[in-house]
Amino acid sequence: MQRRTRGASSLRLARCLTPANLIRGDNAGVPERRIFGGCLLPTPEGLLSAAVGALRQRSDDAQPAFLTCTDRSVRLAARQHNTVPESLIVDGLASDPHYEYIRHYASAATQALGEVELTGGQLSRAILTQYWKYLQTVVPSGLDVPEDPVGDCDPSLHVLLRPTLAPKLLARTPFKSGAAAAKYAATVAGLRDALHRIQQYMFFMRPADPSRPSTDTALRLNELLAYVSVLYRWASWMLWTTDKHVCHRLSPSNRRFLPLGGSPEAPAETFARHLDRGPSGTTGSMQCMALRAAVSDVLGHLTRLANLWQTGKRSGGTYGTVDTVVSTVEVLSIVHHHAQYIINATLTGYGVWATDSLNNEYLRAAVDSQERFCRTTAPLFPTMTAPSWARMELSIKAWFGAALAADLLRSGAPSLHYESILRLVASRRTTWSAGPPPDDMARGPGGHRAGGGTVGKRFSGPARQRAPAPPPTSPTLDPRGHPAVPEAPRGRPAPPLPDADDPVAEPPGCAAQPATYYTHMGEVPPRLPARNVAGPDRRPPAATCPLLVRRASLGSLDRPRGWGPAPEGEPDQMEATYLTADDDDDARRKATHAASARERHAPYEDDESIYETVSEDGGRVYEEIPWMRVYENVCANTANAAPASPYIEAENPLYDWGGSALFSPPPRPPPPPPLSPSPVLARHRANALTNDGPTNVAALSALLTKLKREGRRSR
């Protein structure tokens, strides 16, 4: 008799390959279920989820490792009110000793400098030429200034980037004494490290959610922006001191130096007032201690440089004057570049946490200080626009885009905080007028248009001749060295803002001047997805439901949806998206609601020819995959600590977002294994032999009962 091995049966093998209901003969409707149930066409929510996942992956690739680590996500999730402890920021600084936070910007800047090669001698001569042009507009007439050398180049790109990136200085010995020169080099090296620490602090201080306000982040932003205004006051004093020294060298006679702006305030007074009356010094908050220490370190290096400029002995002759001018421009370029980082980072995304957002008084004061400094010192110091800076930096803009997209996917609509900022930007944008730019104003040096050409062609040719009547102006550069479109002067409407992602885009309206000292060229406000018909102040409770439920209640998923405001040909509808409602807004809202409801529920003309009617017993076209899951992050808190706020996160299992710590909730520890029941042991007869034990008491009771019965019988 042959013994059959288990598992070798043909029936068992068939069951592994064929559904059980087909084997039993019940195959009614199985093909339809397999076809329509197995259809893998992505749902709209799945597509949005995949797009947000791609944004998150792109953002994570551009960030330092500490910003996306699990430990930082867990520590931020345990905080309330979207706050960031300063200890976490300090940990971020310690984790980035090689300045990985700015690697993309440094790479783009190095590539731009490589396309416009200038030797140290050429750059020094070009800086000196720009300085003579500046000095003629500052000092009264009667001062003999050397003539411009023929065929010199435009040093704007190198002045903007080289002092910050190049380790070697152009003017290594600007002082006669060797000890003073060594002190100058050491102070500049320490200043660079101190400026990097402040930039790192700003980079790592961002909370986890940009759609909600953050109190401590707003305080830190106020401190940083107030610190920018202090930097420009110090820079004005440094340039004033250099001008005074150069004028004395050019005219040794007792000619009185009368600058147009007057004598600026001494740096010691400016620094002391900021440390005593600055935003972080007057609030008494303990969440800015490391920031105040970093600011004090920078101000200490600036004080040492100011003392060297005021008391250091310079070399005589032409070389002494050249070294004085070049060293001043180098140091001020480092500080100016650092101030641009803070301002442009605020405009790129950090402004969502600022007090009053873009109407922040410290932001306005910082931009005004930069504008005044660039106007006074033109054409020495160029200024980079915020879109150009964001295209070079990459990581900050990518992070804000991914974070806001994830919040928009979870909630289905922008938060009230985020939407208020968009309304503010849109309301200011409606006051701007557009006009065709003159052809000569839209061209940069060498006749090239501001949006095209290469950096090498733009900066390697001869410098453009400036008219003697208006004062010279400093160019504004894009990341490749292209001059940016100028800003409208005060009192005139500014042009509409182009898209920051389009390097060839030119605004339709330029200023009435050929070039300006400063350009504030922001981005077009991002378009909002379609909201509920009711306004943001009358938002229905259904807005908190999952997106599938809300969209199913509003109509079929295959209805066309309008994303963003109306096209530009309908300005009234576009303005109504963001502007404040007028007196007749209630009546208009009711009429719009009724019209949109009729249009939404009305059948389309071609519905019958396109779609088939699915009967009730036919089954669904595709199987809905549950996409919304709710995670509650329960953190262990002490008895005195406030409970951590739970957060909700959407997840589609079909389109995995990956193991990113900023998307996935922190893993919960596995529950302890269940304890096995202990065996019931025999009960120990405790106190059985003692006088009051249970055994002796029972025996005594029985003995007394027996004696009573025997006594009765004996009677």
Swiss-Prot record:
Phosphorylated by host LCK. The phosphorylation seems to be lymphocyte-specific. Belongs to the herpesviridae HHV-1 VP11/12 protein family. Residues 432-513, 585-605, 659-680 are annotated as: Disordered. This is Tegument protein UL46. It is found in: Virion tegument; Host cell membrane. Pfam families: Herpes_UL46. Residues 456-467, 475-488 have a biased composition (Low complexity). Residues 444-455 have a biased composition (Gly residues). Keywords: Activator, Host cell membrane, Host membrane, Membrane, Phosphoprotein, Transcription, Transcription regulation, Virion, Virion tegument. GO terms for cellular component: host cell plasma membrane; membrane; viral tegument. Signal peptide: none annotated. Residues 664-677 have a biased composition (Pro residues). It is a peripheral membrane protein. Plays a role in the activation of the host PI3K/AKT pathway to promote cell survival. Interacts with and activates host LCK and thereby recruits downstream partners SHC1, GRB2 and PI3KR1 in order to activate the PI3K pathway by phosphorylating host AKT on its activating residues. This mechanism is inhibited by the viral protein US3 that instead promotes incorporation of UL46 into virions. Transmembrane segments: none annotated. Interacts with VP16. Interacts with host LCK, PIK3R1, SHC1 AND GRB2; these interactions promote the activation of the PI3K/AKT pathway. Interacts with host YWHAB. Interacts with ICP0; this interaction targets UL46 for degradation by the proteasome. Its main location: virion.
